[in-house]
A protein has these predicted regions:
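Conserved acidic catalytic loop of the alpha/beta-hydrolase fold
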Residues: 110-128
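A short loop-to-beta-strand scaffold at the N-terminal edge of the catalytic core in hydrolase folds
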Residues: 46-56
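Short, solvent-exposed loop/turn segments at secondary-structure boundaries
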Residues: 101-106
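Hydrophobic/aromatic ligand-binding patch that stacks against planar heteroaromatic rings
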Residues: 81, 118, 141-142
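Short, well-ordered coil/turn elements that cap or connect secondary structure elements
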Residues: 38, 84-86, 124, 147-148
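An N-terminal hydrophobic leader/cap segment in hydrolases
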Residues: 4-43
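Conserved HGGG/HGGXW glycine-rich cap/lid loop of the alpha/beta-hydrolase fold
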Residues: 54-99
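Conserved hydrolase catalytic core segment
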Residues: 126-156
Length: 156
């Protein structure tokens, strides 16, 4: 029969091995997720600085503003699920998400101005604006501050 001390050492060893395997798998998953997100990213030079965004489709411009926990990829995925063809989906990464830096003034009004600057950079005069979850605040600010740029406002 093995002693209590030997059993505890074996248990700790097994826990350490299992933890190492979990960490290794987690690191692989994070690397794969970062690679997948960076593949579709574009950077637009705008009047307020470089902004990351993704774009898909053609037709009526639709600006899809993501919520918390995402980036342009979340905006693209949710908008694509909501609408069929016939839309040019433009999805920015909000301040502090993925490849868009946090400016000195990260307010919803400043974010709205950044959305308008992105539309300028992409030569889009007017767009349907979809604000998803936490993205709704800057979507509302965009409609309030740049109403001539918003053909419809949808909040989810």
């Amino acid at each position: 029969m093995i002693g209590l001390q030997t059993a505890l050492v074996m248990l700790l060893f097994l826990v350490a091995v299992a933890s190492g395997l979990v960490f290794f798998r987690y690191a692989q998953d994070i690397a794969a997720a970062r690679a997948a997100v960076s593949e579709g990213a574009q950077i637009a030079p705008t009047a307020v600085g470089p902004l990351e965004y993704g774009e898909t489709g053609s037709g009526t411009p639709l600006l899809s503003i993501h919520g918390a926990g995402g980036g342009y990829d979340q905006g693209l995925a949710i908008a694509a699920d909501l609408v069929g063809g016939g839309f040019r989906i433009i999805a920015p990464s909000r301040f502090g998400y993925l490849g868009t830096a946090v400016p000195a003034d990260p307010t919803p009004d400043a974010q709205a101005d950044a959305h308008a600057a992105l539309l300028d950079a992409l030569q889009v005069d007017k767009a349907i604006v979809v604000g998803i979850s936490a993205g709704a605040r800057s979507a509302i600010a965009l409609a309030r501050r740049h109403s001539q740029r918003v053909s419809a406002l949808i909040l989810i």
